[in-house]
């Protein structure tokens, strides 16, 4: 169903008001929160201060106090499968990431390439109007590619 025209059409174009809303890209709501994922390798769950650990992490603690902390996520002990889980919300074997990408063997659930139909969080956020940015090592493509 098409949206009703929200502009005004008068006798003269100078007195008319166009409606560009059907052609505008999606935008995140004005009060939408920022989403920040921080992924670290080789850090135990309880190592940082915000989780009761012995390492002093005042900046991370401050971010954690103002945001949401996830304590019931499943990740793996390997970087590629963990990143694929965080990006898609799916189990690493559903993402064909049974191991790190250098060890991908090309068999089902172990090809080292995330199937496009799994979708990724940046795509979903982008469709809803958020801008996304990634920096750092991702390790999500086999070396043969």
Question: What do the PLM-derived regions correspond to, one by one?
Answer:
Residues 1-145:
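Formylglycine-dependent sulfatase
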């Amino acid at each position: 169903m098409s949206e009703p025209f929200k502009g005004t059409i008068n006798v003269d174009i100078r007195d008319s008001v166009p409606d560009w809303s059907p052609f505008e890209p999606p935008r995140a709501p004005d009060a939408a929160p920022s989403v920040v994922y921080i992924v670290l390798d080789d850090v135990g769950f309880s190592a940082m201060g915000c989780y009761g650990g012995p390492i002093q992490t005042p900046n991370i603690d401050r971010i954690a106090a103002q945001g949401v902390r996830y304590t019931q996520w499943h990740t793996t002990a390997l970087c590629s499968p963990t990143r694929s889980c965080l990006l898609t919300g799916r189990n690493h074997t559903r993402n064909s990431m049974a191991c790190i990408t250098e060890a991908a063997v090309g068999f089902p659930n172990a090809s080292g390439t995330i199937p496009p139909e799994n979708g990724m969080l940046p795509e979903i956020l982008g469709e809803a109007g958020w801008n996304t940015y990634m920096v750092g090592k991702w390790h999500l493509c086999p070396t043969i590619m």
